[in-house]
A protein has these predicted regions:
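Nucleotide-sugar donor-binding catalytic core of glycosyltransferases
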Residues: 1-200
Length: 200
């Protein structure tokens, strides 16, 4: 069976390196789906988060889908913009995939999907030789980021710290798999939002 091809607009999956942006679960290449970037024969095109205007303006043929992944704290104003321009958005997109309750209440075009997904590539029980890690970044654009940075200052060298701006790692496994526990603080908390940090 050949894989169904969809175009993907947005840089959400730039960490994937196999040429097919469409890993499925745990870093394995999808069996039935292939993400492409500019295939005129694709079944349709998915636009991720802030690429919403690309879908409205780019003139691509075929079905278009909007996929909202990030929290409302990271993509501030995006949901409000969709609500304010609801008719245009609904005329442009076949389906809007989201975890935002305000959008889900607007009608059948809006379908629930969990925010984000898995980042761990090899699901198994790992041998543990260290106690506590924390994966964070030095971003501070929203309250959750600032809370994480406060924790980083408080815990100091009591945990092994990884992430952008600290001890940078390529894959989350480097900061999780060898540890009994990992401190996770999400950048937002609200109904129907689910963090990949729990799954990782």
């Amino acid at each position: 069976m050949s894989r169904v091809k969809y175009n993907l607009v947005g840089n959400t999956f730039t960490h994937l390196t196999n040429g097919n942006k469409g890993y499925s679960v745990h870093g394995k290449e999808a069996k039935n789906l292939e993400w492409t970037s500019d295939n005129p024969f694709a079944e349709g095109t998915f636009y991720i988060d802030n690429t919403i205007n690309d879908g409205i303006n780019d003139g691509r043929k075929g079905p278009k889908y909007l996929w909202l992944l990030e929290s409302k704290y990271i993509k501030q104003g995006l949901v409000e913009s969709i609500i304010a321009n609801r008719q245009l958005v609904e005329d442009t997109y076949e389906t809007i995939f989201t975890h935002d309750q305000r959008l889900l209440s607007l009608g059948d075009k809006y379908k629930w999907v969990p925010a984000q997904g898995f980042w761990i590539k090899e699901p198994k029980v790992y041998e543990k030789s260290k106690m506590i890690s924390m994966i964070a970044s030095n971003k501070n654009m929203c309250e959750g980021h600032r809370l994480r940075l406060e924790w980083v200052e408080k815990i100091g060298d009591q945990v092994d710290l990884y992430g952008r701006g600290f001890n940078e790692i390529v894959d989350k496994e480097e900061g999780l798999c060898d540890y009994m526990f990992s401190v996770a603080i999400e950048n937002g908390q609200y109904e129907t939002y689910f963090t990949e940090k729990i799954l990782d």
